[in-house]
Protein backbone atom coordinates (compact mmCIF):
# COMPACT_ATOMS: atom_id res chain seq x y z
CA UNK A 1 0.00 0.00 0.00
CA UNK A 2 1.44 3.37 -1.11
CA UNK A 3 2.13 5.77 1.78
CA UNK A 4 0.91 8.67 -0.37
CA UNK A 5 -2.61 7.33 0.20
CA UNK A 6 -2.28 8.85 3.68
CA UNK A 7 -1.20 12.31 2.59
CA UNK A 8 -3.26 15.47 3.02
CA UNK A 9 -2.66 19.20 2.70
CA UNK A 10 -1.97 20.91 6.03
CA UNK A 11 -1.35 24.68 6.19
CA UNK A 12 1.58 25.37 8.51
CA UNK A 13 -0.43 27.86 10.58
CA UNK A 14 -2.67 25.02 11.81
CA UNK A 15 0.24 23.32 13.61
CA UNK A 16 -0.33 24.27 17.26
CA UNK A 17 2.86 25.82 18.69
CA UNK A 18 1.72 26.31 22.28
CA UNK A 19 -0.84 24.58 24.50
CA UNK A 20 -4.16 26.28 25.18
CA UNK A 21 -4.41 28.10 28.50
CA UNK A 22 -6.97 25.56 29.77
CA UNK A 23 -6.45 21.93 28.80
CA UNK A 24 -10.09 21.01 28.36
CA UNK A 25 -11.02 23.99 26.14
CA UNK A 26 -9.65 22.29 23.02
CA UNK A 27 -12.06 21.33 20.27
CA UNK A 28 -13.31 17.79 19.71
CA UNK A 29 -14.24 16.26 16.39
CA UNK A 30 -16.48 13.21 16.78
CA UNK A 31 -16.17 10.66 13.96
CA UNK A 32 -18.47 7.69 13.51
CA UNK A 33 -16.11 4.97 12.31
CA UNK A 34 -18.89 3.12 10.46
CA UNK A 35 -20.69 5.93 8.62
CA UNK A 36 -18.04 8.65 8.53
CA UNK A 37 -20.50 11.12 10.08
CA UNK A 38 -18.81 14.07 11.82
CA UNK A 39 -19.83 16.30 14.72
CA UNK A 40 -17.93 19.41 15.85
CA UNK A 41 -17.80 19.79 19.65
CA UNK A 42 -15.56 20.91 22.51
CA UNK A 43 -13.48 18.49 24.56
CA UNK A 44 -15.67 18.77 27.67
CA UNK A 45 -18.50 17.34 25.54
CA UNK A 46 -16.72 13.98 25.83
CA UNK A 47 -18.87 13.61 28.96
CA UNK A 48 -21.91 13.17 26.71
CA UNK A 49 -20.27 10.48 24.58
CA UNK A 50 -18.96 8.26 27.38
CA UNK A 51 -21.51 6.34 29.41
CA UNK A 52 -21.83 4.40 32.64
CA UNK A 53 -20.02 1.09 32.24
CA UNK A 54 -17.52 2.40 29.68
CA UNK A 55 -13.80 2.38 30.50
CA UNK A 56 -11.15 4.91 29.52
CA UNK A 57 -7.63 3.48 29.17
CA UNK A 58 -4.97 6.07 30.02
CA UNK A 59 -1.20 5.88 29.56
CA UNK A 60 0.42 7.07 32.79
CA UNK A 61 3.93 7.38 31.37
CA UNK A 62 5.83 10.53 32.33
CA UNK A 63 8.05 12.49 29.92
CA UNK A 64 11.70 12.80 30.88
CA UNK A 65 13.48 16.14 30.40
CA UNK A 66 15.52 14.07 27.99
CA UNK A 67 17.44 16.74 26.04
CA UNK A 68 20.85 17.60 27.52
CA UNK A 69 23.41 20.19 26.43
CA UNK A 70 27.02 19.43 27.27
CA UNK A 71 30.61 19.88 26.15
CA UNK A 72 33.36 17.47 25.14
CA UNK A 73 35.85 17.33 28.00
CA UNK A 74 38.89 17.43 25.72
CA UNK A 75 37.89 20.23 23.31
CA UNK A 76 34.94 22.07 24.88
CA UNK A 77 32.86 21.51 21.71
CA UNK A 78 29.10 21.73 22.28
CA UNK A 79 27.21 18.41 22.15
CA UNK A 80 23.45 17.86 22.33
CA UNK A 81 22.24 14.53 23.72
CA UNK A 82 18.74 13.09 23.56
CA UNK A 83 18.01 10.17 25.89
CA UNK A 84 15.99 7.46 24.15
CA UNK A 85 16.04 4.28 26.20
CA UNK A 86 17.64 3.08 29.42
CA UNK A 87 19.44 -0.18 28.82
CA UNK A 88 21.07 -1.47 31.99
CA UNK A 89 22.23 0.50 34.98
CA UNK A 90 23.50 3.88 33.80
CA UNK A 91 23.81 2.90 30.14
CA UNK A 92 21.45 4.66 27.73
CA UNK A 93 20.65 4.51 24.05
CA UNK A 94 20.84 8.14 22.86
CA UNK A 95 20.93 10.41 19.84
CA UNK A 96 23.78 12.92 19.76
CA UNK A 97 24.45 16.01 17.62
CA UNK A 98 26.86 16.47 15.96
CA UNK A 99 27.36 12.70 15.93
CA UNK A 100 30.71 12.85 14.12
CA UNK A 101 32.30 14.47 17.19
CA UNK A 102 31.35 11.63 19.53
CA UNK A 103 33.34 8.42 19.16
CA UNK A 104 33.91 5.51 21.52
CA UNK A 105 35.74 6.82 24.57
CA UNK A 106 34.53 10.42 24.16
CA UNK A 107 33.59 11.99 27.51
CA UNK A 108 30.82 14.62 27.63
CA UNK A 109 30.32 16.90 30.63
CA UNK A 110 26.97 18.45 31.61
CA UNK A 111 26.27 21.13 34.20
CA UNK A 112 29.96 21.88 34.82
CA UNK A 113 30.68 18.25 35.62
CA UNK A 114 27.61 17.50 37.72
CA UNK A 115 26.83 14.77 35.16
CA UNK A 116 29.25 13.03 32.81
CA UNK A 117 28.78 10.52 30.01
CA UNK A 118 31.26 8.24 28.25
CA UNK A 119 30.50 6.90 24.78
CA UNK A 120 30.66 3.10 24.85
CA UNK A 121 29.19 2.29 21.43
CA UNK A 122 27.91 3.74 18.16
CA UNK A 123 24.91 3.09 15.90
CA UNK A 124 23.34 4.48 12.72
CA UNK A 125 21.62 7.88 12.35
CA UNK A 126 23.49 9.56 15.20
CA UNK A 127 22.81 6.80 17.71
CA UNK A 128 25.28 6.44 20.59
CA UNK A 129 25.40 4.31 23.72
CA UNK A 130 26.40 6.48 26.66
CA UNK A 131 27.27 5.45 30.20
CA UNK A 132 26.57 8.17 32.78
CA UNK A 133 28.44 8.90 36.01
CA UNK A 134 27.24 11.24 38.78
CA UNK A 135 26.83 11.71 42.52
CA UNK A 136 23.26 11.54 43.78
CA UNK A 137 20.02 10.48 42.08
CA UNK A 138 20.09 10.41 38.28
CA UNK A 139 16.52 11.61 37.68
CA UNK A 140 16.92 14.52 40.10
CA UNK A 141 20.04 15.66 38.21
CA UNK A 142 18.23 15.15 34.90
CA UNK A 143 15.32 17.24 36.18
CA UNK A 144 17.76 20.05 36.94
CA UNK A 145 19.87 19.92 33.76
CA UNK A 146 17.54 18.50 31.11
CA UNK A 147 15.00 20.12 28.79
CA UNK A 148 11.70 18.72 27.54
CA UNK A 149 12.25 17.09 24.13
CA UNK A 150 9.49 18.83 22.18
CA UNK A 151 8.68 17.50 18.70
CA UNK A 152 10.62 19.05 15.79
CA UNK A 153 7.53 20.82 14.42
CA UNK A 154 7.16 22.90 17.61
CA UNK A 155 9.37 25.99 17.32
CA UNK A 156 8.11 27.93 20.35
CA UNK A 157 9.69 27.64 23.81
CA UNK A 158 7.55 25.79 26.35
CA UNK A 159 7.00 28.13 29.30
CA UNK A 160 5.58 25.50 31.68
CA UNK A 161 7.01 21.96 31.61
CA UNK A 162 3.87 20.53 33.17
CA UNK A 163 1.88 21.40 30.05
CA UNK A 164 3.75 18.62 28.21
CA UNK A 165 2.69 16.10 30.88
CA UNK A 166 -0.71 14.55 31.45
CA UNK A 167 -2.24 15.33 34.86
CA UNK A 168 -1.97 11.60 35.70
CA UNK A 169 1.66 11.11 34.54
CA UNK A 170 3.44 8.81 36.98
CA UNK A 171 5.96 6.38 35.44
CA UNK A 172 8.98 8.29 34.10
CA UNK A 173 10.50 7.01 30.87
CA UNK A 174 9.06 8.71 27.75
CA UNK A 175 10.86 10.86 25.21
CA UNK A 176 7.50 12.36 24.14
CA UNK A 177 4.09 12.86 25.71
CA UNK A 178 1.06 10.66 25.00
CA UNK A 179 -0.64 13.78 23.69
CA UNK A 180 -4.28 12.64 23.57
CA UNK A 181 -4.18 12.66 27.37
CA UNK A 182 -3.15 16.32 27.56
CA UNK A 183 -6.79 17.41 27.17
CA UNK A 184 -7.92 15.89 30.47
CA UNK A 185 -8.03 17.86 33.71
CA UNK A 186 -8.42 16.29 37.14
CA UNK A 187 -11.90 17.86 37.31
CA UNK A 188 -12.98 16.30 34.01
CA UNK A 189 -11.69 12.88 35.06
CA UNK A 190 -13.60 13.21 38.34
CA UNK A 191 -16.83 14.06 36.46
CA UNK A 192 -16.35 10.97 34.29
CA UNK A 193 -15.90 8.79 37.36
CA UNK A 194 -19.03 10.27 38.94
CA UNK A 195 -20.91 9.34 35.77
CA UNK A 196 -19.82 5.71 36.16
CA UNK A 197 -17.02 5.71 33.59
CA UNK A 198 -14.13 3.52 34.79
CA UNK A 199 -10.50 4.64 34.49
CA UNK A 200 -7.81 2.06 33.73
CA UNK A 201 -4.08 2.78 33.56
CA UNK A 202 -1.33 1.23 31.47
CA UNK A 203 2.24 2.34 30.73
CA UNK A 204 3.87 2.66 27.34
CA UNK A 205 7.07 4.69 27.18
CA UNK A 206 6.91 6.77 24.01
CA UNK A 207 10.05 6.72 21.89
CA UNK A 208 11.23 9.27 19.34
CA UNK A 209 10.33 6.86 16.55
CA UNK A 210 6.90 8.43 16.95
CA UNK A 211 8.21 11.45 15.02
CA UNK A 212 10.32 9.61 12.46
CA UNK A 213 8.80 9.87 8.99
CA UNK A 214 8.01 6.70 7.07
CA UNK A 215 10.92 6.54 4.63
CA UNK A 216 9.73 3.48 2.68
CA UNK A 217 7.55 3.92 -0.43
CA UNK A 218 5.06 1.32 0.74
CA UNK A 219 3.63 0.62 4.18
CA UNK A 220 4.68 -3.03 4.08
CA UNK A 221 8.37 -2.06 3.84
CA UNK A 222 8.27 0.12 6.96
CA UNK A 223 9.71 -1.23 10.23
CA UNK A 224 8.23 0.15 13.44
CA UNK A 225 10.32 1.26 16.40
CA UNK A 226 9.90 -0.80 19.57
CA UNK A 227 8.49 0.71 22.77
CA UNK A 228 8.25 -0.71 26.29
CA UNK A 229 4.78 -1.38 27.71
CA UNK A 230 3.29 -2.72 30.93
CA UNK A 231 -0.23 -3.68 31.99
CA UNK A 232 -0.95 -4.78 35.56
CA UNK A 233 -3.20 -7.62 36.72
CA UNK A 234 -5.52 -5.01 38.25
CA UNK A 235 -5.97 -3.21 34.91
CA UNK A 236 -6.43 -6.47 32.98
CA UNK A 237 -9.11 -7.63 35.45
CA UNK A 238 -10.94 -4.30 35.18
CA UNK A 239 -10.93 -4.35 31.37
CA UNK A 240 -12.21 -7.93 31.26
CA UNK A 241 -15.03 -7.03 33.69
CA UNK A 242 -16.00 -4.08 31.49
CA UNK A 243 -16.14 -6.37 28.44
CA UNK A 244 -18.19 -9.00 30.28
CA UNK A 245 -20.70 -6.36 31.39
CA UNK A 246 -21.14 -4.96 27.87
CA UNK A 247 -19.17 -1.74 28.40
CA UNK A 248 -16.89 -0.15 25.83
CA UNK A 249 -13.12 0.06 26.07
CA UNK A 250 -12.04 3.52 24.89
CA UNK A 251 -8.30 4.07 24.57
CA UNK A 252 -6.85 7.53 25.13
CA UNK A 253 -4.20 7.81 22.46
CA UNK A 254 -2.41 5.57 20.02
CA UNK A 255 -0.03 4.43 22.78
CA UNK A 256 -2.82 2.91 24.88
CA UNK A 257 -4.21 1.39 21.68
CA UNK A 258 -0.86 -0.19 20.79
CA UNK A 259 -0.54 -1.64 24.28
CA UNK A 260 -3.96 -3.30 24.35
CA UNK A 261 -3.79 -4.55 20.78
CA UNK A 262 -0.29 -5.97 21.34
CA UNK A 263 -1.45 -7.92 24.38
CA UNK A 264 -4.64 -9.13 22.67
CA UNK A 265 -2.65 -10.19 19.59
CA UNK A 266 -0.13 -12.11 21.69
CA UNK A 267 -2.79 -13.85 23.83
CA UNK A 268 -5.44 -14.99 21.32
CA UNK A 269 -7.63 -11.93 21.75
CA UNK A 270 -7.51 -11.95 25.55
CA UNK A 271 -6.35 -9.11 27.81
CA UNK A 272 -4.04 -10.13 30.63
CA UNK A 273 -1.20 -8.72 32.71
CA UNK A 274 1.86 -8.36 30.49
CA UNK A 275 4.97 -6.31 29.85
CA UNK A 276 7.57 -6.23 27.11
CA UNK A 277 8.49 -4.43 23.90
CA UNK A 278 6.04 -3.82 21.10
CA UNK A 279 6.64 -2.93 17.46
CA UNK A 280 3.04 -3.54 16.39
CA UNK A 281 2.13 -1.69 13.19
CA UNK A 282 -1.58 -1.12 12.55
CA UNK A 283 -2.70 -0.01 9.10
CA UNK A 284 -5.81 -0.71 6.96
CA UNK A 285 -6.48 -4.43 6.95
CA UNK A 286 -5.58 -4.85 10.63
CA UNK A 287 -8.44 -6.35 12.68
CA UNK A 288 -8.85 -4.76 16.10
CA UNK A 289 -9.21 -7.20 18.97
CA UNK A 290 -9.47 -5.11 22.13
CA UNK A 291 -10.81 -1.59 21.68
CA UNK A 292 -14.22 -0.09 20.91
CA UNK A 293 -13.27 3.57 20.62
CA UNK A 294 -10.30 5.91 20.44
CA UNK A 295 -9.54 9.46 21.57
CA UNK A 296 -6.60 10.86 19.65
CA UNK A 297 -5.08 14.08 18.31
CA UNK A 298 -4.73 15.03 14.64
CA UNK A 299 -1.55 13.47 13.24
CA UNK A 300 1.10 14.18 10.61
CA UNK A 301 0.47 13.36 6.95
CA UNK A 302 1.83 9.95 5.92
CA UNK A 303 2.61 9.05 9.56
CA UNK A 304 2.14 5.62 11.15
CA UNK A 305 -0.35 7.27 13.52
CA UNK A 306 -2.77 8.39 10.81
CA UNK A 307 -2.43 4.86 9.40
CA UNK A 308 -3.49 3.44 12.78
CA UNK A 309 -6.55 5.70 12.91
CA UNK A 310 -7.33 4.73 9.29
CA UNK A 311 -7.16 1.06 10.23
CA UNK A 312 -9.76 1.70 12.93
CA UNK A 313 -12.12 4.04 11.06
CA UNK A 314 -11.55 3.46 7.32
CA UNK A 315 -9.05 5.53 5.34
CA UNK A 316 -11.69 7.42 3.35
CA UNK A 317 -13.56 8.40 6.53
CA UNK A 318 -10.36 9.57 8.21
CA UNK A 319 -9.03 11.60 5.29
CA UNK A 320 -12.45 13.20 4.82
CA UNK A 321 -12.44 14.08 8.55
CA UNK A 322 -8.91 15.52 8.31
CA UNK A 323 -9.82 17.65 5.31
CA UNK A 324 -12.87 18.86 7.24
CA UNK A 325 -10.59 19.66 10.21
CA UNK A 326 -8.36 21.76 7.95
CA UNK A 327 -11.39 23.57 6.54
CA UNK A 328 -12.71 24.26 10.07
CA UNK A 329 -9.24 25.35 11.23
CA UNK A 330 -8.71 22.73 13.94
CA UNK A 331 -5.32 22.83 15.65
CA UNK A 332 -3.03 19.93 14.70
CA UNK A 333 -0.41 17.69 16.34
CA UNK A 334 0.84 17.52 19.94
CA UNK A 335 -0.70 20.72 21.34
CA UNK A 336 -3.67 20.55 18.98
CA UNK A 337 -7.31 19.50 19.17
CA UNK A 338 -8.75 16.01 19.63
CA UNK A 339 -10.86 13.46 17.81
CA UNK A 340 -13.17 10.82 19.31
CA UNK A 341 -13.65 7.82 17.03
CA UNK A 342 -16.22 5.11 17.75
CA UNK A 343 -19.18 3.25 16.28
CA UNK A 344 -22.55 4.99 16.64
CA UNK A 345 -20.72 7.96 18.17
CA UNK A 346 -23.70 10.14 19.02
CA UNK A 347 -24.24 12.46 21.95
CA UNK A 348 -26.62 11.23 24.65
CA UNK A 349 -28.23 13.42 27.28
CA UNK A 350 -27.31 11.26 30.23
Swiss-Prot record:
The EC number(s) this enzyme carries: 2.4.99.17
Keywords associated with the record: Cytoplasm, Queuosine biosynthesis, S-adenosyl-L-methionine, Transferase
Main location: cytoplasm
GO terms for biological process, alphabetical: queuosine biosynthetic process; tRNA wobble guanine modification
Metabolic or biological pathway: tRNA modification; tRNA-queuosine biosynthesis
Alphabetical list of InterPro entries matching this protein: QueA, QueA_dom1, QueA_dom2, QueA_sf
HAMAP family: QueA
Family statement: Belongs to the QueA family.
Subunit (UniProt): Monomer.
Name of protein: S-adenosylmethionine:tRNA ribosyltransferase-isomerase
Protein source organism: Bacillus cereus (strain G9842)
Amino acid sequence: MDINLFDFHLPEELIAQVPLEDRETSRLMVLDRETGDIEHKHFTDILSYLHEGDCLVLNETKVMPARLHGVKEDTGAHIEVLLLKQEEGDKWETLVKPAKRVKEGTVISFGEGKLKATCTGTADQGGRQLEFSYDGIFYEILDELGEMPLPPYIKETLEDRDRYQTVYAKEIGSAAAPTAGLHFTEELLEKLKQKGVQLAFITLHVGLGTFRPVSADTIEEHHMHAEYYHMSEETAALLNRVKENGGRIITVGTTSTRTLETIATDHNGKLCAASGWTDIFMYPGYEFKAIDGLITNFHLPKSTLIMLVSAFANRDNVLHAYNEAVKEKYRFFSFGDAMFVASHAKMRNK
